[in-house]
From Swiss-Prot:
Stated name of the protein: Peptide chain release factor APG3, chloroplastic
Induction statement: By light.
Highest taxon of the lineage: Eukaryota
Record key words, sorted: Chloroplast, Growth regulation, Plastid, Protein biosynthesis, Transit peptide
InterPro entries tied to this protein: PCRF (IPR005139), Pep_chain_release_fac_I (IPR000352), Pep_chain_release_fac_I_sf (IPR045853), Prokaryotic/Mito_RF (IPR050057), RF-1 (IPR004373)
Lineage: Eukaryota, Viridiplantae, Streptophyta, Embryophyta, Tracheophyta
Length: 422
């Protein structure tokens, strides 16, 4: 037996057995694992003992592991250590690959143990007890390899560079008049509850209250750990079906609100030409006090190229409202840029991933049946707890769906590439 092979507990119990040469028939397990002949010829000793159904996965992981090793060598270089900026950059790059390398090495270890156990199963002969023990180990290793393969596929997927960012979340009343404004207020509270559950910092940026309750439009700032990665799936049209408080006949009305998720952008990413801005001040109708309607603290900002108008009143000073207005403008312009890029990618991939288009109806909140239906997931959730901020199950399901579709795209791309090269 190859002495360099990682030895399983069952294998160690049989090291005294004679390893006579024989050939194992090549066959695949449900996980896509296939066996090769044993012992390998001298020319094949350096090849993989177990192979995957997707060779691209192995090639990619081997490339990642090679990069990780190269980074490890560089980090030990005294010249790099003395340059803190370079050292931190390389250390960050290496840490981002740590999980991939750890899982891949465990995957290779399990592959070797699996082949070893298969060999021992042949050597066990008629020993039923030993055959049962080896069979149990083979099943265990096969299942672990399947799970590790799934992890590796997910780790292969490109990460969204915006996932770690804070966001500005805008909810805007759609069709439905006063009821749409009230529904907008309900959604604002839902996201506030979800932020509290997630230990995020939630604050109002700019809100236009409606006459009969709720908001015509409301913009919130949410800061915390990987906010965008969770809330990016909320972009789209949210439809509600319920009997409005003002409805005397008990008829169910349908109203909508549109949610936009805008990752925070800095001044370097979005350059705003002062000549494109019209800025005026106005009197604020704040929460009360001597300054109401006496001091012009509100800011009315108009961006001429895009037609975006922002009215900020939430802060107590004109300077802070101006800063908020420009912050929101940058986020809106950046969100437009990101959305256009994502749309271009979706068109190129011919993908139907429903994770952002504003015109898309993503959910229906049905009060009569106390049910929330996510149309992308084709899943239902309990209305009361959902509106109280219990969004995590839906968020995780959206993330899983996106991963699944990205993996399908990756497999199709690899298949097309293989067909072309073949």
């Amino acid at each position: 037996m190859n002495s360099s092979m990682t030895t399983s507990p069952t294998a160690r119990a049989f090291l005294h057995l004679h390893s006579s040469p024989f050939t194992l028939r090549s066959r695949k397990s449900p996980s896509g694992v296939c066996l090769v002949s044993w012992p390998p010829s001298r020319s094949r000793r350096t090849r993989r003992l177990v192979c995957m159904a997707e060779p691209y996965l192995i090639r990619k992981m081997e490339s990642v592991e090679k990069t990780w090793k190269e980074l490890s060598v560089k980090l030990a270089d005294p010249d790099v250590v003395s340059n803190q900026s370079e050292y931190q950059k390389l250390a960050q790059s290496m840490s981002e690959l740590d999980e991939v390398v750890t899982v891949f090495r465990r995957f290779k270890d399990c592959e070797k143990q699996l082949l070893e156990s298969k060999v021992l199963a042949k050597e066990a002969g008629d020993d039923e007890d030993m055959a049962e023990m080896i069979g149990s180990e083979i099943n265990s290793l096969t299942k672990e390899i399947e799970e590790l393969e799934k992890q590796l596929k997910v780790l292969l997927l490109p990460s969204d560079p915006l996932d770690a960012r804070n966001i500005l979340l805008e909810v805007r009343a759609g069709t439905g008049g006063d009821e749409a404004a009230i529904w907008t207020g309900d959604l604002v509270r839902m996201y506030q509850r979800y932020s509290e559950r997630s230990s995020w910092k939630f604050s109002m940026v700019s809100c236009s209250e409606a006459e009969h309750g709720g908001y015509k439009t409301c913009v919130m700032e949410i800061k915390g750990n990987r906010v965008y990665s969770k809330l990016k799936y909320e972009s789209g049209v949210h439809r509600v079906q319920r009997v409005p408080q003002t409805e005397t006949q008990g008829r169910v009305h349908t109203s909508t609100a549109t949610v936009a998720i805008m990752p925070e952008a800095d001044e370097v990413e979005v350059v705003i030409d002062p000549k494109d801005i019209e800025l005026t001040s106005a009197r604020s109708g704040g929460a009360g006090g001597q300054n109401v309607n006496k001091v012009e603290t509100a800011i009315d900002l108009f961006h001429k190229p895009s037609g975006i108008r922002i009215f900020c009143t939430e802060e107590r000073t004109q300077i802070r409202n101006k800063a908020r207005a420009f912050q929101l403008l940058r986020a809106k312009l950046y969100e437009i840029k990101v959305r256009e890029q994502q749309e271009k990618i979706r068109n190129e991939r011919k993908s139907q991933v429903g994770t952002g288009a504003r015109s898309e109806k993503i959910r229906t909140y049905n009060y009569k049946d106390s049910r929330v239906t996510d149309h992308r997931l084709k899943m239902n959730f309990a209305l009361t707890t959902f509106l109280d901020g219990a969004l995590e199950d839906a968020v995780q399901a959206c993330a899983a769906l996106e991963q699944k579709e990205l993996m399908e795209e990756l497999s199709e791309s690899v298949a097309a590439s293989s067909a072309t090269s073949g």
